[in-house]
């Protein structure tokens, strides 16, 4: 069972598209169709507006916090085809970089695991995915995967830096042999997995097919040291799938239908321990799902968005009536 512990009045003048807590859970970033990005201090249940960032010329779809080892850095992407990277310096938030390399709306931004350095993946409606790597002295290197998804890319999500199974297989004191990977979802109804080659170029490693409409979001689950990789995906078709891969080569992925909703599903997000999946969609609910001992996914709680402190525990029998 979950309950609403805090409600933030953002004072956005239009629809809010994304809200993300920072690493420490003390700051909340929001973005809206009013073209603004706002940052709030939400410690102790409060809400203090820290920054109102203006720089986009269209609806802002998504925000993403970088790991705090690089400072207070936030990325935002917009319908205006731009990605803006904001940084706090001496208590003031300022635009530190603007990426204008896409020909259409940029729909998703996601920072790579901090082990790799400061790397940002950006998915766009022009079908391309760009990867921005900070090289120092305010400079960013750009690599682009053209035609990553026909019609457009809606979501990007990095694989964890910890190699699956490394906590039990890795020799003591030896640095893991990281292989950079990320997943993307697009308007071609596909999830694609991408891998960085030895020459630094990105190659499509796998196509995952199960959805019958646009893939709206993908989320690669955090690694907890087990020799398994897990990805959640959701779609315009109302379905949420959980994909698992148990082989070391990463070539065999098996989908399991978590649930078929009666409306579009916009977002999926894993808990830090990768055992609970949050799902939100057009039914105006956020539902939490957990895998039972028999391998079935069970809805353990739901919260009606915009309805205040509603808390409901949903049994496996009830979920089938939703």
Swiss-Prot record:
Keyword Transport: yes
Membrane topology: Peripheral membrane protein
Any one GO molecular-function label of the UniProt entry: structural molecule activity
GO terms under cellular component: COPII vesicle coat; endoplasmic reticulum membrane; GATOR2 complex; lysosomal membrane; nuclear pore outer ring
Activity regulation statement: The GATOR2 complex is negatively regulated by the upstream amino acid sensors CASTOR1 and SESN2, which sequester the GATOR2 complex in absence of amino acids. In the presence of abundant amino acids, GATOR2 is released from CASTOR1 and SESN2 and activated.
Compartmental location: Cytoplasmic vesicle, COPII-coated vesicle membrane; Endoplasmic reticulum membrane; Nucleus, Nuclear pore complex; Lysosome membrane
Record InterPro entries: Sec13/Seh1_fam (IPR037363), WD40/YVTN_repeat-like_dom_sf (IPR015943), WD40_repeat_dom_sf (IPR036322), WD40_rpt (IPR001680)
GO terms under biological process: cellular response to nutrient levels; COPII-coated vesicle budding; mRNA transport; positive regulation of TOR signaling; positive regulation of TORC1 signaling; protein exit from endoplasmic reticulum; protein import into nucleus; protein localization to plasma membrane
Record flagged with keyword Repeat: yes
Phosphoserine carried by residues: 184
Principal subcellular localisation of the protein: membrane
Keywords for the protein's UniProt record, in alphabetical order: Acetylation, Cytoplasmic vesicle, Endoplasmic reticulum, ER-Golgi transport, Lysosome, Membrane, mRNA transport, Nuclear pore complex, Nucleus, Phosphoprotein, Protein transport, Repeat, Translocation, Transport, WD repeat
Signal sequence interval, chain numbering: none
WD repeats by residue range: 11-50, 55-96, 101-144, 148-204, 210-253, 260-299
Record PTM N-acetylvaline, positions in chain: 2
Subunit structure: At the nuclear pore: component of the Y-shaped Nup107-160 subcomplex of the nuclear pore complex (NPC). The Nup107-160 subcomplex includes NUP160, NUP133, NUP107, NUP98, NUP85, NUP43, NUP37, SEH1 and SEC13. At the COPII coat complex: interacts with SEC31A and SEC31B. Interacts with SEC16A. Interacts with SEC16B. Component of the GATOR2 subcomplex, composed of MIOS, SEC13, SEH1L, WDR24 and WDR59. The GATOR2 complex interacts with CASTOR1 and CASTOR2; the interaction is negatively regulated by arginine.
Function: Functions as a component of the nuclear pore complex (NPC) and the COPII coat. At the endoplasmic reticulum, SEC13 is involved in the biogenesis of COPII-coated vesicles. Required for the exit of adipsin (CFD/ADN), an adipocyte-secreted protein from the endoplasmic reticulum. As a component of the GATOR2 complex, functions as an activator of the amino acid-sensing branch of the mTORC1 signaling pathway. The GATOR2 complex indirectly activates mTORC1 through the inhibition of the GATOR1 subcomplex. GATOR2 probably acts as an E3 ubiquitin-protein ligase toward GATOR1. In the presence of abundant amino acids, the GATOR2 complex mediates ubiquitination of the NPRL2 core component of the GATOR1 complex, leading to GATOR1 inactivation. In the absence of amino acids, GATOR2 is inhibited, activating the GATOR1 complex.
Similarity-based family: Belongs to the WD repeat SEC13 family.
Full protein name: Protein SEC13 homolog
Protein source organism: Bos taurus
UniProt gene name: SEC13
